[in-house]
Every structure is written in structure tokens, then in C-alpha cells.
Amino acid sequence: MNTRPADFSAVQAATSLTQFRSASPLVHCLTNDVVQSFTANVLLALNASPAMVVDPEEAAQFSAVADALLINVGTLERSRAEAMRTAVNSAHQAGTPWVLDPVAVGGLIFRSEFCRELLAWKPAAIRGNASEIMALAGLAAQGRGVDSADDSLAALPAARELARQVGTIVAVTGAVDYVTDGERDIAITGGDSMMTRVVGTGCALSAVVAGFCSLEGDRVSHVAAACYVMALAGQQAASVSQGTGSFIPNFLDRLYTLRAEDLA
């Protein structure tokens, strides 16, 4: 039986958020076409600087000077895969932390093989839903596109194993988020079901995780803090929204106004 880990401390989340806003990291996002604008707006709301440089040669140059890199394979095709390869290789050589969002891995062969190939370049973190994390770890999963039929707690053992195999941090997200480095587990509660009814909240979270990975200090705590901040903003935005149309601006507003004292 899986026992749920202890909840993440709001005080730790507040410390990481303060550090993040002060650092204003430059996050290079090679993400999917559906969520580029929303992802950029989420990063801007948190005082980060987003960049979407997609040409293979330029992507390699830019990832070496960015503070963090996001690889999201949601709308993967062969030319974009080449840009992602060059960017990840360049980031790896430069010591730039990069995050993998393995969208729909397990259900589709090309992206599944591609994401497993990228693991050789040692991502700082991997963020996915339960089905994606289980599939990337080599276990059977019940995914349907970007959705997951698996419970995040049920995927925690797979997340631990994946973290150990790759030497990374894994965030498996769902009704409760779990962050692990293979030895240490953290639970993050909050959020709202409305976050699953709009496009891009998970993809944007992966970009925020990338930015938080660029911070000095305890990276496991920083990844958990990224999940905590997004879940809290989602929960608070949903409480004042009539539906998904009003949720998105309320979510961005809450991220923009959220301060450490609101957390601690």
C-alpha cells in the first residue's frame, strides 16, 4: 500500500517564490503550439522572462545562455524534435537546467522513443501526469492523449524509480501532486478541478518548474514550490470564477499578485 508523503511546507514555498521573483529567470520554452501564449503569460505573471526560440541553430545558441530550458513534446514533429535535440545538448554542455514534459508518452511511438532518447542528457526535472510518468518509467499506464486515467499516488513508485534511473527530480501531478528525487517524497495539495478544464495549466506548470530549477539551493524543494504556487493560484482563482472563461484571467491575476506573505 502506498502511504502519502508529508505535505509541503508553505514557509518553504514562500521562500522559493521570493527567490524566484527576485531572480526573474529567463526560461527558454520549446513547447507545444497550443499553449505558447498561455505559458508565456504565466511566466510573466511570476516575474520570469519567457522566450520561444524554435529554429534549431538559434535554439542551441539560446539554451546555452538562458537560465532554464523547457522541452514539451505536445505537438512534436520531426523538425521540432531536431530543435529540441540541439537545445538540450547545448543546455547540457552549458550546465543549463532543463525540464522534460513528456506529453502523451506511452500512447504514441515517436514521442515515446524521442523522450527516452532525451533522458541521456539528464534533465533537472521531469513533470507529467501519472500515465506519462508510468509510461516513461516503462510501466503500463492508462493514458488517453494528454489525460490520465491513473492516480498520481499510484504512480509515485514509478516516479521514484524513474528519478533514480535518470538521476533527476520527478513531479507527478494530479489531484495531489508528488515530487520525488527517488529518496525523498513531497506531497502538494490544492488546485481545483477547473484547472483540468482549460488548456495549458500543466504545460505552464512545467515551464514554471524549469524556472524554479534555475534557483540556488534545494532543487527538490524548489520543484515542490513551483507546484505549490500554481496549485494555490488555481484554487484561489477558481473560488472567484463562474466558469472556465473567467478562470484564466483570474488565474493570471492571482499569480501576478501572489506574494510570499500570502503563503507563509
Swiss-Prot record:
One of its GO terms (biological process) is thiamine biosynthetic process. Substrate binds at residues 52, 200. SUPFAM superfamilies: Ribokinase-like. It catalyses: 5-(2-hydroxyethyl)-4-methylthiazole + ATP = 4-methyl-5-(2-phosphooxyethyl)-thiazole + ADP + H(+). Signal peptide: none annotated. Belongs to the Thz kinase family. Pathway: Cofactor biosynthesis; thiamine diphosphate biosynthesis; 4-methyl-5-(2-phosphoethyl)-thiazole from 5-(2-hydroxyethyl)-4-methylthiazole: step 1/1. Keywords: ATP-binding, Kinase, Magnesium, Metal-binding, Nucleotide-binding, Thiamine biosynthesis, Transferase. Its cofactor is Mg(2+). ATP binds at residues 127, 173. Its EC number is 2.7.1.50. This is Hydroxyethylthiazole kinase. GO terms for molecular function: ATP binding; hydroxyethylthiazole kinase activity; magnesium ion binding. It is an enzyme of class 2 (transferase). Catalyzes the phosphorylation of the hydroxyl group of 4-methyl-5-beta-hydroxyethylthiazole (THZ).
